[in-house]
UniProtKB/Swiss-Prot annotation:
Source organism: Escherichia coli (strain SMS-3-5 / SECEC)
Keyword annotations from UniProtKB, A to Z: Chaperone, Cytoplasm
InterPro entries xrefs: Uncharacterised_CoxE, Uncharacterised_ViaA, VWF_A, vWFA_dom_sf
Protein name, as recorded: Regulatory protein ViaA
SUBUNIT field: Homodimer. Interacts with RavA.
Gene Ontology annotations for the cellular component aspect, listed alphabetically: cytosol
Pfam families given in the database record: VWA_CoxE
Cytoplasm listed as a keyword: yes
Function: Component of the RavA-ViaA chaperone complex, which may act on the membrane to optimize the function of some of the respiratory chains. ViaA stimulates the ATPase activity of RavA.
Location of the protein in the cell: Cytoplasm
Lineage: Bacteria, Pseudomonadati, Pseudomonadota, Gammaproteobacteria, Enterobacterales
Length: 483
């Protein structure tokens, strides 16, 4: 079967001109003009897609098959070119019959040309072939235009669908032209309106939590280069958190006598239900003689000191990818879950704007992974946002997964971010020592985004930076009131 590309070559039909005309008509369509005016950042991204469209159209024309009737007519034309004038005269009745049988547009004109001349001369032979060639060129051009029109309709439908999706997501995920271009590339997947509306929903939630958005932006800008100190010696007040022993619920350290009802031993609590021993229970409660669990831990207090002011010049460092671990335990459900997902969406926005990678790991009893900055980033983001936080907490496995990822060459300059309430068991010593080694030797930075004011200091002290966003009701009301 003859291909359209071969036919174009045989008849010297310029398909490039037809393709360019089609693309110009597509870009000038009213739908795209309105979209470009509304979303100017996406105009450059769509324009950058033109070479891909051009290549796809070339491929479509190259692979298209010529109809059998036109193929047979072209073969007859090629054979007729090889005939001498006497041979052509002999074959002419068969040629005319073939053209009539194939319903060729040239058939009627060919018969009229022959009937108008009683003698077939060499000049008439040449004229017959020239006009036949023109007829074939018209048919080939029409076939090209039909195929390109079909492709234009399909391409316009695809572009309109992607424009609708990108237009919805552009205010949420595109912070500059780089992000707009990457967002347009991601929109090539097959998504339904209800799917990406989930991203819109969490984007609106993020806008309602400006403090959370600012926190993500501060974390994204936190990597700075070597500082150059200056010799200015003014004093300033400096506040820092210091760790000290305290009775916080981290681990059981033994038994003690106290009046702490929340930490009573079960036998002591049982005496309260016995009438004869009830007064004895109250006496021991007043005298702080009840047997209770003794808990050991650490807490933090603010220490105020004075130190010389040090002015520094900062040279911005290249920023690496994000590896974000999200705690999906039951305690992270509800408002915590919304904040954690919205925070990851904010990091995705930063990653798209700065051409960084954003890799999400959900940890509870198992680890689930998503890459939000890849070609399928929007689909991955939708799957991530669809997850429910109902598991347990296995922080050690989370750190092991992070460390395994940091060993690979492509993640050597990554920053690790752990989003949790940090109400969990202490980390094993081998995990702690490995994290410290990565911080010391490879300069990897570990960030904690604490969603609770009750996170265990013993866990959180391993991080380079702690970004606090208290999701308690009191803090939520205070933030709303300050706005």
């Amino acid at each position: 079967m003859l291909t359209l590309d071969t036919l174009n070559v045989m008849l010297a039909v310029s398909e490039e001109g037809l393709i360019e005309e089609m693309i110009i008509a597509l870009l000038a369509s009213p739908q795209l003009a309105v979209f470009f005016e509304k979303f100017p950042r996406l105009k450059a991204a769509i324009t950058d897609d033109v070479p891909r469209w051009r290549e796809a159209l070339r491929s479509r024309l190259k692979d298209a098959r010529v109809p059998p009737e036109l193929t047979e007519e072209v073969m007859c034309y090629q054979q007729s070119q090889l005939l001498s004038t006497p041979q052509f005269i002999v074959q002419l009745p068969q040629i005319l019959d073939l053209l009539h049988r194939l319903n060729s547009p040239w058939a009627e004109q060919a018969r009229q040309l022959v009937d108008a001349n009683s003698t077939i001369t060499s000049a008439l032979h040449t004229l017959f072939l020239q006009r036949w060639r023109l007829s074939l060129i018209v048919q080939a051009t029409t076939l090209n235009q039909q195929l390109l029109e079909e492709e234009r309709e399909q391409l316009l439908s695809e572009v309109q669908e992607r424009m609708t999706q990108s237009g919805q997501l552009e205010p949420i995920l595109a912070d500059n032209n780089t992000a707009a271009g990457r967002l347009w590339d991601m929109s090539a997947g097959q998504l339904k309106r209800g799917d990406y509306q989930l991203i819109v929903k969490y984007g609106e939630f993020l806008n309602e939590q400006p403090e959370l958005k600012r926190l993500a932006e501060q974390l994204g800008r936190s990597r700075e280069a070597k500082s150059i100190p200056r010799n200015d010696a003014q004093m300033e007040t400096f506040r820092t958190l210091v760790r000290e022993p305290a009775t916080v619920p981290e681990q059981v350290d033994g038994l003690q006598q106290s009046d702490d009802i929340l930490r009573l031993l079960p036998p002591e609590l049982a005496t309260l239900g016995i009438t004869e021993l009830e007064y004895e229970f109250y006496r021991r409660l007043v005298e702080k003689q009840l047997l209770t669990y003794r808990l050991h831990g650490e807490s933090w207090r603010e220490k105020v000191i004075e130190r010389p002011v040090v002015h520094k010049d900062y040279d911005e460092q290249p920023r690496g990818p994000f590896i974000v671990c999200v705690d999906t335990s039951g305690s992270m459900g509800g408002f915590n879950e919304q904040c954690a997902k919205a925070f990851c969406l904010a990091l995705m926005r930063i990653a798209l704007a700065e051409n960084r990678r954003c890799y999400i790991m959900l940890f509870s009893t198992e680890i689930v992974r998503y890459e939000l900055s890849g070609p399928q980033g929007i689909e991955q983001a939708i799957r991530f946002l669809s997850q429910r936080f109902r598991g347990g907490t296995d922080l050690a496995s989370c750190f092991r997964a992070i460390m395994e990822r940091l060993q690979s060459r492509e993640w050597f300059d990554a920053d690790a971010v752990v989003i949790s309430d940090f109400i969990a068991q202490r980390l094993p010593d081998d995990v702690t020592s490995k994290v410290k080694e990565l911080q010391r030797v490879h300069q990897h930075r570990f960030h904690a985004v604490a969603m609770s004011a009750h996170g265990k200091p013993g866990i959180m002290r391993i991080f380079d930076h702690i970004w606090r966003f208290d999701t308690g009701m009191r803090s939520r009301l205070l933030r709303r009131w300050r706005r």
